[in-house]
Amino acid sequence: MRLIILNLLSLGITPSVVGHSGPHRQETQNLNNFLESNAINPAAINGETRHTGGVHLACAILEASNQTAVVFPSDGELYTQIDKAHASATAPKNPACIYTPNDVKGVSLGVKVATFVQAKFAIRSGGHSPMEYFANIDGGVLISLAGIKTLEYNADTQTQRSGFGNLWQDVYRHVNAQGRTVVGGRTGSVGLALTLGGGLSHFSNAYGWAAQNVLSYEMVLADGSIVIASEEENSDLYFAVKAGANNFGIVTHIVQRTYPLGKIWGGSMIFPGNASAQFMAALADYQAKGQLDKKSAILPYVGLIADAVVAQFSYLEPVERPEAFEAFYDIPVIQDLTQVWDTFAAMVTAPIPYNMTRFSYATTDLLYDKEAYLEIERICHKYIPRMRKLEGGDIMLMPQPISVSMVGEARARGSDPMGVADQPQLWFVVSSGWNLAQDDAEAESIMLDALAEVEEYTKSRALHLPFYFLNDAFSTQMPLQSYGAVTYGKLQAASRKYDPTRVFQELVPGGFKLV
C-alpha cells in the first residue's frame, strides 16, 4: 500500500481511503481533486457511493466519465451478453461492472480509477482463454477492449496497426485486401492477446512466432501513462511483453510486419476416430519431411470420444493437395473441406467442425519421436471411460509439430523470450470438453491426470522438454518460469520498473503472475 501511495503522490494525486469510517473533509477533497484532474464533475458521484468506496466507487466514476461505456448487472440482457462473450462457458464471471472504452485514453482512465480506489479488475481482448479469471472477474471491474477497433495499413512501411478489440479475422480481412498478411492466429475468432504469449501461427514455419513479428506494442501502464514498447523505445518492456502476458500493462494496439500473400490452399479434413493412431504416425512423417516446406502448416484436433480427427491444413500457395502433406493422403477421409481460397481470411473464418460448450486445456513439450507420438495417444485413450461419465464429455488432443525453421525464423526477428529449443518437437495439448458446470473439477482432473501420465512417459524416455507454451497452458502450470532463469529475471525486472506498485500483480488476479 505504501508503494501505491508513493506512486499516486508522484502523479500529484492523494489517494482516497473512503469506505472505512465515512468520508472526511480531506478524503472528499482528495477524491474531488482526482475527479477534476480527469475531467469528471465531482457532483456526479453521490455521498453514498463515496462512502461505499472500492469497486462501486470505481464503477460510478467510470460511468460518470462515459455513461454508455459502463454496463451493470441491472442492465440485464446487455450485461449478460457482454459478460458471456467468451469461447468457453467456464470463463464468464460476475463483474460489478463492465467498462468498454473506445480509445486508449479511456483505457488509461480505467486503470487510473481502479488504482486510485484499489479495485480489482480484469482485462479482456478476444476472450478465447477458458481459464477462470484470466479474462473476467467476480465483483471487480471488467475492462473490455472490444471498443478498440483500429485497423490501419501503412503502404509506405508495409505495416499493419490493429486495436485489441479486433479478432484475427478482422485483421486478416483488412490486410488481405492489400495483398498482404500478418502473422496471427490460426482461427479467425481468436483475439490479438495471442501476441502476449509468443503466438503460434499458420505462418510460423515461414516467419516465426506472431510476437516476433510485432514491431511495437502500445500500452497503458499502471500509472495510466501511455507508452510504446519496441526495439527502439522501452526495449526491455518490449522483450517482456512478447511472452509475458498481462504482467506489465494493458496493450491497446500492435504494429506488425506484413508479408505478400495471394491465393492459398487449405481447410479441414475429417478422418474417422479409429484412424487416430494412423494420423499420429502420419503427423510424425510430415514433421520429418513435409514440414521442411516452410509454406506448410497443420492444426490437428484428435477427438477421442467424438470419434473424429479434424485437421486444418494450410499451404501458402494455391496448390491442390501439396506434396508436403502426402503422409496424410492415405488415411480414409470422412469429409474433405480443403480447397483453394481467394484469401487467408476466408479460410480461417470457415467453421471448424468441432465445438465444445465448456472446455479447458493443458500442455507439455517433447522432442520429436514417432514411437512416442503413438504412445502418448494410447495413454490418453485410457482416460476415455472416466470422461464418458460426464455429459458431453470428450478428450481432445492437439499435437502441434514445431519445426527448427519456426525457431530459427523467430530468432532471426529479434530476441525471443520463450527460448524454444532449436530441435524438432511437439507441443502436445490435452483438452477436455463437457457440458455441465457441476463437472468442471472432474473434467479438469481427468485432463491433468492424462497429461501427468504423458509427462511421466516422456521423462522416462528423456524426451520431455521443460517448456510450457503460455497460450496453451493450464492455470496451475508455470510457463513464465519455463523460459529459464535468465529470461524470468528479465520479466521480473521489467515488472518492477514499469509497475513498481504491483498493480498488475495484485489488482489483476487473473493470468500467469510473476512471483
Swiss-Prot record:
| Recorded GO MF terms | FAD binding; isomerase activity; oxidoreductase activity
**What's its catalytic activity?**
prosolanapyrone II + O2 = prosolanapyrone III + H2O2; prosolanapyrone III = (-)-solanapyrone A; prosolanapyrone III = solanapyrone D
- Which range is the signal sequence, renumbered to this chain? 1-25
Q: Which InterPro entries match?
A: FAD-bd_PCMH, FAD-bd_PCMH-like_sf, FAD-bd_PCMH_sub2, FAD-linked_Oxidoreductase, Oxid_FAD_bind_N
Domain FAD-binding PCMH-type as annotated: residue spans: 91-261
Q: One Pfam family for this entry, by name?
A: FAD_binding_4
Q: What is its EC number?
A: 1.1.3.42, 5.5.1.20
- For this entry, the protein name equals Bifunctional solanapyrone synthase
State the species of origin. Answer: Alternaria solani
Taxonomic lineage of the native organism: Eukaryota, Fungi, Dikarya, Ascomycota, Pezizomycotina
